[in-house]
């Protein structure tokens, strides 16, 4: 029923719990890890965890697109390598995919960080508002949609960054559904760079995108 598609690049540190969280579900037909040229053994590690590995050129848009092309199921779920779905996620997915008209809608999970820092709680609220009001859930919230909808909107663009924003804008806010489940994402990048600085940079990158800057340029700024 469901293909899980995970883009990776040197992801051995956090990949095991991500795959473990979805592997046991009866809904999952396959787990595809689309690797962009890791040098840390990610490809071999993913295989040992039960995933089917596809080698791609680096770039998340490219990797997600390759994953969708190689997936065999009628439902696709795109998930970041450092994002872990909390128990109960499969119940919310089952309820979504069996609902009338679900094939023309896409679902995403509630964003949560694995950090007790008060900044993390504030950011989670900000993401919830961005998702609900603006209709802009990011890739670290997961994205669930039917193969037919994926094809109808043109699939993921093969761009290095903002592929998630580009995709959900084409799906349309009225067709996005908040699932009753939580996606817990690593807070490492916020801890390393500082919450405030990373949030400012994320907002700046989003602004650049809406102003028409190229994804390649935005990717350089994001780093």
Spans of features found by a protein language model:
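Conserved donor NDP-sugar-binding/catalytic core segment of glycosyltransferases
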Residues: 88-119
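Hydrophobic helical membrane-anchoring modules
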Residues: 169-223
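Short aromatic/hydrophobic "clamp" motif used to bind/position activated sugar donors
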Residues: 76
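Acidic helix N-cap motif at the loop->helix transition within catalytic regions
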Residues: 13-17, 40-49
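A conserved acidic beta->alpha catalytic loop
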Residues: 35-43, 83
């Amino acid at each position: 029923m469901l293909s899980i598609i995970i883009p990776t690049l040197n992801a051995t540190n956090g990949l095991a719990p991500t795959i473990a969280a979805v592997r046991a579900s009866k809904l999952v037909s396959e787990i595809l890890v689309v690797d962009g040229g890791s040098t840390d053994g990610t490809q071999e590690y993913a295989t040992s965890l039960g995933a089917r590995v596809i080698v791609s050129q680096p770039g998340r848009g490219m990797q997600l697109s390759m994953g969708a092309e190689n997936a065999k199921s009628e439902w696709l779920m795109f998930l970041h390598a450092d994002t872990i779905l909390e128990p109960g996620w499969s119940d919310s997915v089952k309820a979504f995919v069996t609902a009338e008209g679900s094939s023309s809608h896409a679902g995403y999970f509630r964003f949560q960080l694995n950090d007790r820092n008060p900044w993390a709680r504030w950011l989670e609220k900000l993401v919830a508002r961005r998702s609900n009001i603006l209709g802009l859930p990011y890739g670290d919230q997961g994205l669930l949609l039917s193969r037919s909808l994926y094809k109808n909107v043109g699939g993921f663009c093969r761009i290095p960054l903002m592929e998630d924003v580009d995709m959900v804008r084409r799906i349309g806010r009225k067709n996005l559904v908040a699932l009753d489940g939580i996606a817990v994402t690593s807070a490492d990048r916020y801890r390393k760079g500082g919450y405030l600085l990373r949030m400012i940079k994320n907002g700046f990158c989003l602004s650049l995108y809406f102003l028409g800057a190229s994804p390649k340029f935005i990717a350089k700024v994001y780093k």
